[in-house]
Protein backbone atom coordinates (compact mmCIF):
# COMPACT_ATOMS: atom_id res chain seq x y z
CA UNK A 1 0.00 0.00 0.00
CA UNK A 2 1.44 3.33 -1.09
CA UNK A 3 1.45 6.20 1.39
CA UNK A 4 0.76 9.76 0.22
CA UNK A 5 1.88 12.77 2.26
CA UNK A 6 -0.64 15.61 2.35
CA UNK A 7 0.39 18.91 3.93
CA UNK A 8 -2.19 20.13 6.44
CA UNK A 9 -2.77 23.06 8.79
CA UNK A 10 -4.78 23.00 11.97
CA UNK A 11 -7.63 25.51 12.08
CA UNK A 12 -10.23 26.68 14.53
CA UNK A 13 -13.81 25.72 13.68
CA UNK A 14 -15.01 28.94 12.07
CA UNK A 15 -18.03 30.75 10.77
CA UNK A 16 -19.28 30.42 7.22
CA UNK A 17 -17.45 33.62 6.30
CA UNK A 18 -14.17 32.13 7.57
CA UNK A 19 -14.69 28.96 5.55
CA UNK A 20 -15.53 31.01 2.47
CA UNK A 21 -12.26 32.93 2.80
CA UNK A 22 -10.37 29.68 3.34
CA UNK A 23 -11.75 28.26 0.08
CA UNK A 24 -11.08 31.51 -1.77
CA UNK A 25 -7.39 31.08 -0.87
CA UNK A 26 -7.29 27.63 -2.50
CA UNK A 27 -7.73 25.61 0.69
CA UNK A 28 -10.29 22.99 1.65
CA UNK A 29 -11.68 22.75 5.19
CA UNK A 30 -11.44 19.21 6.49
CA UNK A 31 -11.92 17.11 9.61
CA UNK A 32 -9.80 14.29 11.04
CA UNK A 33 -11.77 12.04 13.35
CA UNK A 34 -11.45 8.84 15.35
CA UNK A 35 -14.09 7.17 17.49
CA UNK A 36 -13.76 8.23 21.12
CA UNK A 37 -11.34 11.09 20.41
CA UNK A 38 -11.90 14.81 19.77
CA UNK A 39 -12.05 15.67 16.07
CA UNK A 40 -9.31 17.85 14.59
CA UNK A 41 -10.31 20.71 12.28
CA UNK A 42 -7.75 21.28 9.54
CA UNK A 43 -7.29 22.55 6.01
CA UNK A 44 -5.43 21.18 2.99
CA UNK A 45 -4.55 22.62 -0.40
CA UNK A 46 -7.29 21.88 -2.93
CA UNK A 47 -4.78 21.22 -5.71
CA UNK A 48 -3.04 18.56 -3.60
CA UNK A 49 -6.34 17.04 -2.49
CA UNK A 50 -7.52 16.64 -6.09
CA UNK A 51 -4.51 14.44 -6.82
CA UNK A 52 -5.62 12.15 -4.00
CA UNK A 53 -9.25 12.04 -5.11
CA UNK A 54 -8.60 11.48 -8.82
CA UNK A 55 -6.58 8.29 -8.54
CA UNK A 56 -7.38 4.70 -9.48
CA UNK A 57 -5.73 3.27 -6.35
CA UNK A 58 -6.39 3.34 -2.62
CA UNK A 59 -3.81 5.03 -0.41
CA UNK A 60 -2.95 5.67 3.19
CA UNK A 61 -2.72 9.44 3.62
CA UNK A 62 -0.19 10.88 6.05
CA UNK A 63 -1.49 14.28 7.10
CA UNK A 64 1.65 16.30 7.82
CA UNK A 65 1.00 19.33 10.02
CA UNK A 66 3.10 22.48 10.19
CA UNK A 67 4.56 21.44 13.57
CA UNK A 68 6.06 18.35 11.92
CA UNK A 69 3.63 15.78 13.33
CA UNK A 70 2.04 13.26 10.97
CA UNK A 71 -1.29 11.50 11.29
CA UNK A 72 -1.93 8.37 9.17
CA UNK A 73 -5.45 8.39 7.78
CA UNK A 74 -7.82 7.39 5.01
CA UNK A 75 -10.20 9.76 3.27
CA UNK A 76 -13.77 8.74 4.03
CA UNK A 77 -15.77 11.44 2.26
CA UNK A 78 -15.55 14.66 0.28
CA UNK A 79 -18.01 17.14 -1.20
CA UNK A 80 -18.00 19.24 -4.35
CA UNK A 81 -19.69 22.53 -5.19
CA UNK A 82 -22.16 21.48 -7.92
CA UNK A 83 -21.76 24.80 -9.75
CA UNK A 84 -17.99 25.37 -9.65
CA UNK A 85 -16.78 21.75 -9.18
CA UNK A 86 -14.50 22.97 -6.39
CA UNK A 87 -13.96 20.72 -3.37
CA UNK A 88 -15.83 22.16 -0.39
CA UNK A 89 -14.99 19.72 2.41
CA UNK A 90 -13.20 16.45 3.20
CA UNK A 91 -13.34 13.94 6.04
CA UNK A 92 -10.37 11.81 7.12
CA UNK A 93 -10.38 8.89 9.54
CA UNK A 94 -7.35 8.47 11.79
CA UNK A 95 -5.71 5.05 11.48
CA UNK A 96 -4.41 2.95 14.36
CA UNK A 97 -2.14 0.03 13.48
CA UNK A 98 -4.06 -2.42 15.68
CA UNK A 99 -7.58 -1.31 14.70
CA UNK A 100 -9.61 -2.53 11.76
CA UNK A 101 -10.80 0.03 9.25
CA UNK A 102 -13.57 -0.08 6.64
CA UNK A 103 -12.54 1.22 3.22
CA UNK A 104 -13.57 1.08 -0.43
CA UNK A 105 -10.93 -0.48 -2.68
CA UNK A 106 -10.93 -0.42 -6.51
CA UNK A 107 -11.32 -3.72 -8.39
CA UNK A 108 -8.71 -4.46 -11.06
CA UNK A 109 -9.83 -7.08 -13.58
CA UNK A 110 -7.15 -9.18 -15.24
CA UNK A 111 -7.16 -11.87 -17.92
CA UNK A 112 -8.97 -12.24 -21.24
CA UNK A 113 -12.25 -14.11 -20.64
CA UNK A 114 -12.95 -17.26 -22.68
CA UNK A 115 -16.30 -15.73 -23.61
CA UNK A 116 -14.62 -12.66 -25.11
CA UNK A 117 -12.44 -14.88 -27.31
CA UNK A 118 -15.71 -16.37 -28.59
CA UNK A 119 -17.05 -12.92 -29.44
CA UNK A 120 -18.71 -11.88 -26.19
CA UNK A 121 -18.45 -8.53 -24.42
CA UNK A 122 -17.46 -7.72 -20.85
CA UNK A 123 -19.81 -5.59 -18.75
CA UNK A 124 -18.52 -4.53 -15.32
CA UNK A 125 -21.22 -3.36 -12.90
CA UNK A 126 -19.14 -3.03 -9.72
CA UNK A 127 -15.83 -1.17 -9.64
CA UNK A 128 -15.10 -1.01 -5.90
CA UNK A 129 -15.39 -3.37 -2.94
CA UNK A 130 -16.02 -2.28 0.62
CA UNK A 131 -13.72 -4.25 2.92
CA UNK A 132 -12.61 -4.37 6.56
CA UNK A 133 -8.92 -4.90 7.30
CA UNK A 134 -5.96 -3.73 9.35
CA UNK A 135 -4.07 -0.74 7.91
CA UNK A 136 -1.06 -2.98 7.22
CA UNK A 137 -3.24 -5.22 5.02
CA UNK A 138 -4.97 -2.44 3.09
CA UNK A 139 -4.48 -3.09 -0.66
CA UNK A 140 -4.14 -0.41 -3.35
CA UNK A 141 -6.60 -2.47 -5.39
CA UNK A 142 -8.09 -5.96 -5.48
CA UNK A 143 -7.09 -8.02 -8.52
CA UNK A 144 -9.76 -10.37 -9.89
CA UNK A 145 -8.86 -12.95 -12.55
CA UNK A 146 -11.72 -13.24 -15.05
CA UNK A 147 -9.92 -15.32 -17.72
CA UNK A 148 -12.09 -18.42 -17.10
CA UNK A 149 -15.42 -16.64 -17.57
CA UNK A 150 -17.43 -17.94 -20.51
CA UNK A 151 -20.15 -16.25 -22.52
CA UNK A 152 -23.31 -15.78 -20.52
CA UNK A 153 -21.57 -16.08 -17.15
CA UNK A 154 -21.76 -13.53 -14.36
CA UNK A 155 -19.61 -13.11 -11.27
CA UNK A 156 -21.07 -11.99 -7.95
CA UNK A 157 -19.33 -10.66 -4.86
CA UNK A 158 -19.85 -13.93 -2.99
CA UNK A 159 -17.98 -15.82 -5.71
CA UNK A 160 -14.86 -13.64 -5.69
CA UNK A 161 -12.79 -15.50 -3.09
CA UNK A 162 -11.29 -17.96 -5.60
CA UNK A 163 -10.63 -15.18 -8.13
CA UNK A 164 -8.83 -12.65 -5.90
CA UNK A 165 -5.06 -12.72 -6.31
CA UNK A 166 -3.99 -10.64 -3.28
CA UNK A 167 -2.70 -12.79 -0.41
CA UNK A 168 -3.85 -10.56 2.43
CA UNK A 169 -6.43 -10.81 5.16
CA UNK A 170 -9.62 -8.80 4.77
CA UNK A 171 -13.37 -9.19 5.09
CA UNK A 172 -15.63 -8.18 2.21
CA UNK A 173 -18.55 -6.04 3.41
CA UNK A 174 -20.26 -5.51 0.05
CA UNK A 175 -23.48 -7.49 -0.42
CA UNK A 176 -22.51 -11.02 -1.49
CA UNK A 177 -25.33 -11.08 -4.06
CA UNK A 178 -24.20 -7.90 -5.82
CA UNK A 179 -23.17 -8.53 -9.46
CA UNK A 180 -19.57 -7.65 -10.28
CA UNK A 181 -18.98 -8.46 -13.94
CA UNK A 182 -20.64 -10.38 -16.79
CA UNK A 183 -19.65 -11.70 -20.20
CA UNK A 184 -22.51 -10.94 -22.57
CA UNK A 185 -23.33 -12.51 -25.90
CA UNK A 186 -22.96 -10.09 -28.83
CA UNK A 187 -26.12 -8.24 -29.72
CA UNK A 188 -27.97 -9.01 -32.91
CA UNK A 189 -26.99 -6.13 -35.17
CA UNK A 190 -30.28 -5.84 -37.05
CA UNK A 191 -33.02 -7.90 -38.60
CA UNK A 192 -32.40 -8.98 -42.17
CA UNK A 193 -33.61 -6.38 -44.66
CA UNK A 194 -36.79 -7.41 -46.50
CA UNK A 195 -36.27 -8.71 -50.01
CA UNK A 196 -37.81 -6.44 -52.65
CA UNK A 197 -40.47 -8.17 -54.77
CA UNK A 198 -39.52 -9.03 -58.30
CA UNK A 199 -40.87 -6.75 -61.01
From Swiss-Prot:
A GO MF annotation of the entry reads:
5S rRNA binding
Question: Which Pfam families does the protein's record reference?
Answer: Ribosomal_L25p, Ribosomal_TL5_C
| Gene Ontology biological process terms from the UniProt entry | translation
UniProt keywords, alphabetically: Ribonucleoprotein, Ribosomal protein, RNA-binding, rRNA-binding
Q: Which GO terms describe its cellular component?
A: cytosolic large ribosomal subunit
SUPFAM superfamilies attached here?
Ribosomal protein L25-like (SSF50715)
Q: State the coiled-coil residue ranges.
A: none
Describe the subunit structure: Part of the 50S ribosomal subunit; part of the 5S rRNA/L5/L18/L25 subcomplex. Contacts the 5S rRNA. Binds to the 5S rRNA independently of L5 and L18.
Q: What does this protein do?
A: This is one of the proteins that binds to the 5S RNA in the ribosome where it forms part of the central protuberance.
Protein name listed in UniProt: Large ribosomal subunit protein bL25
What is the gene name?
rplY
Amino acid sequence: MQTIVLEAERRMPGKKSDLKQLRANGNVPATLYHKGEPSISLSVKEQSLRKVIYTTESHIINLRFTDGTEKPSVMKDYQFNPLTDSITHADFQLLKSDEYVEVEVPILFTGNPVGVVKGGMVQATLHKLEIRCLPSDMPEHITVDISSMDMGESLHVGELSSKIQEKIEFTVLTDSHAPVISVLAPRVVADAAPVAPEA
